[in-house]
Amino acid sequence: MLLRNLVAEFLGTAMLLATVVGSGILLHKIDAGNVAVTVIGIAFATGCVLYALIQMLGSLSAHFNPVVTLVNALQRNIRWISVAPYIAAQVLGAMAGVILANLMFDGSPISISTTERHGTGQLLGEFIATFGLIGVIFGTSRNKPDAVPQSVSLYVAGAILFTSSTCFANPAVTISRMLTSTICGIRPTDVPAYIGIQLMGGLTALLFFSWLYNANAKDSQSATAAPGDTDLPKTLKAPHAFVLPDDYNIHEQERELTGAK
């Protein structure tokens, strides 16, 4: 089961990055110098394909993002022993997607980017983008789990347009986009700051929305509970798109990772 989850993460992240970079390359050829046209097209293509990928692979695993994986581990939705394999699959998949996009448009498989992405404004944009992404996943998975694919894909499409950084919001995306010298690239020296601010945004979102929804649950419970009943309702799990399926044997996962029988 773990192997299939990792393959799903690899495939989904690869297709996501092929979409981002491929659409960027194509649209930049026809935008006549108007970069806004390219960004709008990337947002539309990314939102559409991300929705399809979550629907396609959600029954297995559809994090496609190390920050989402780390947040799930911190919430104890997945074992920490799974985190490294998940992140490795996501990063390798993202790199494969970028390479495929380069090749589709007759470029070199790998061409290191020189596109500068730095400064307070862009880092703030990345913090906001990642904070919002985790918030959308966290809140929608509790209020309307079936709407997570729509909510996440719409948010990402919108965040590409409204943030100064064009919403990387994903360390695997950031690392892989070093490998394309196109409009979608990022200079290697700018990558550490992007990843650091993404992790900060994700962790801040986890703390904030955990407080927000726990406080809401406590208020609701206090209004309806019998005197002396102080137990809070259990936190709802996120839908299968962002956590392991409910019937997954976590001990089987550990055996697969360690090679034990």
Briefly describe each language-model feature range:
Residues M1-K261:
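Membrane-interface helix-loop junctions and terminal tails of multi-pass membrane proteins
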